[in-house]
């Protein structure tokens, strides 16, 4: 309803160009499950898989066919990208979302292998320290929660997003 949207706008200090009504239940989730701290000291167990994973319609077409998020996160992302589109930013896409423990383990090991090739004299601890500057061990990644996305509008993840018009709008 209009009253609910107005109350939300007042609470968050923002007004929106899109009609937020269909998204309000998703962007104001009160379930503690959506307030989960995941990092190097608060790990997810290896068998943790969110039950409500759903495909994101905003997946970048140069990687996996689909990216998944928890339902509320997917709907909140949909609202965010709809609002971005109202400001002319239509090219931001999801490059990574949910990752299983096993997939995060695979990625971390691939990154370690790549760094070993680049730094053949480095110890395992040094290699791990390098990789930990841009990736995390399995269980430590917010991606496993299904609540996290990586996204950008660049042809390569090696280019800085920070100076783009989209990043300035986001800030």
Regions found by a protein language model. Name each.
Residues 1-97, 101-171:
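Extracytoplasmic cell-surface/polysaccharide-interacting catalytic and binding patches
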């Amino acid at each position: 309803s209009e009253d609910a949207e107005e109350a939300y706008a007042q609470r968050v200090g923002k007004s929106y160009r899109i009609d937020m009504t269909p998204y309000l239940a998703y962007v104001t989730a009160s379930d503690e499950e959506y307030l989960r701290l995941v990092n190097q000291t608060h790990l997810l167990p290896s068998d943790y898989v969110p039950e409500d994973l759903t495909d994101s319609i905003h997946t970048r077409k140069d990687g996996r066919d689909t990216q998944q998020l928890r339902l509320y996160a997917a709907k909140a992302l949909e609202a965010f990208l709809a609002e971005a589109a109202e400001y002319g930013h239509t090219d931001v896409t999801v490059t990574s979302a949910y990752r299983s423990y096993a997939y995060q383990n695979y990625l971390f090991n691939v990154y370690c292998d790549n760094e070993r090739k680049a730094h053949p004299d480095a110890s395992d601890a040094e290699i791990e320290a390098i990789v930990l500057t841009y990736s995390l061990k399995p269980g430590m990644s917010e991606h496993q929660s299904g609540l996290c996305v990586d996204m950008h509008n660049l042809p390569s993840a090696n280019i800085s997003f920070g100076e783009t018009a989209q990043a300035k709008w986001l800030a």
